[in-house]
From Swiss-Prot:
CDD domains: B_lectin (cd00028)
Modified residues (S-nitrosocysteine): C374
PANTHER family listed in its UniProt record: BULB-TYPE LECTIN DOMAIN-CONTAINING PROTEIN, EP1-LIKE GLYCOPROTEIN 2
One example GO MF annotation: carbohydrate binding
Signal peptide range: 1-22
Lineage: Eukaryota, Viridiplantae, Streptophyta, Embryophyta, Tracheophyta
Localization, UniProt: Secreted; Secreted, Cell wall
Protein name per its UniProtKB record: EP1-like glycoprotein 2
Amino acid sequence: MSRFAILVTLALAIATVSVVIAQVPPEKQFRVVNEGEFGEYITEYDASYRFIESSNQSFFTSPFQLLFYNTTPSAYILALRVGLRRDESTMRWIWDANRNNPVGENATLSLGRNGNLVLAEADGRVKWQTNTANKGVTGFQILPNGNIVLHDKNGKFVWQSFDHPTDTLLTGQSLKVNGVNKLVSRTSDSNGSDGPYSMVLDKKGLTMYVNKTGTPLVYGGWPDHDFRGTVTFAVTREFDNLTEPSAYELLLEPAPQPATNPGNNRRLLQVRPIGSGGGTLNLNKINYNGTISYLRLGSDGSLKAYSYFPAATYLKWEESFSFFSTYFVRQCGLPSFCGDYGYCDRGMCNACPTPKGLLGWSDKCAPPKTTQFCSGVKGKTVNYYKIVGVEHFTGPYVNDGQGPTSVNDCKAKCDRDCKCLGYFYKEKDKKCLLAPLLGTLIKDANTSSVAYIKY
């Protein structure tokens, strides 16, 4: 036999052995069907849910469990839930596999010998998968920290849910500039598909955006804070002595590299970092074991952390951090705080701005509706009504707009822009900000801050 033939035979033998090694053993394979009775306990979003059960595999690692749930009939999401059945408090959904591609009745979740975890409709159409076929997967596991993993024979992760966050970060989970770098909100409690709010990590910082018009607008976050490419939601113990922790700290930690620029914490409408040791942001300090916590970008654009308080007898989930908090009187900075439209002062929606002035606010308050929001048609003029002492939610993050410029030039830009619903003008600094979205208008004690709203 020639040397070439020997080499080819040897390569084929090695490949054959590799394929055998890469297979999931029969006792670790599973195929489960979305069918049967719904669970009886209260869950977030008022969702109906079904347990996933297999003789070969456990889908529960306390307090985390993988299930199917729906908020609309016959549209199921494969999701991870946190909470215990004996608790009276609502159990929470903290990871979705197929939020934009729900499945129907009798859908299947399967892990075959090739190591690919597949969610498919009853007719076989694949709706979601891990794309891990023939990559050495030998098993499936839900870890005690809520990370769902597919691992190889050495325990190394081939795929993990921590690399694919949706709207939530669990303790120890990260966003990465060179990976999945954002959280995206749900559309609503009843609609789990991608919503208009996002929190994005880039080389400049961690920034919150709202996009309802095709133009992303910044409304929160830490846009000038250097996280060095990775930000991790963490909970650490603070010790008063060598043995007993006195408190637990909720943190946003940057990548573990030396020296960081503390960033520009200019008058942002948010909670400011409590200290900045090595670039770490201290969100809050709690006096109980907050190891089971999560950070959630809500469907309303809010950013909140919740911590599980095991000693409580009722309502064991506690809101342990809020970016738009009542404590810092920053609720008015949330674009959706007053619904579609409203005038907000000190955490209260006090008025509904109209061409007739500031009227009483209700959840029916809305900006003027018209199809002619620009002066592109010959002879067409655009009308505005004026609100004195008001600020747009994005103003603090864009240095109040562009300028210096005159109020007439600012108006002319909004006149010509069909997407512009109004403009905000800083008379003292001669700054101009065009607004394609209005939402919650924030009272400004400075009467030289004026809004002009189209109608």
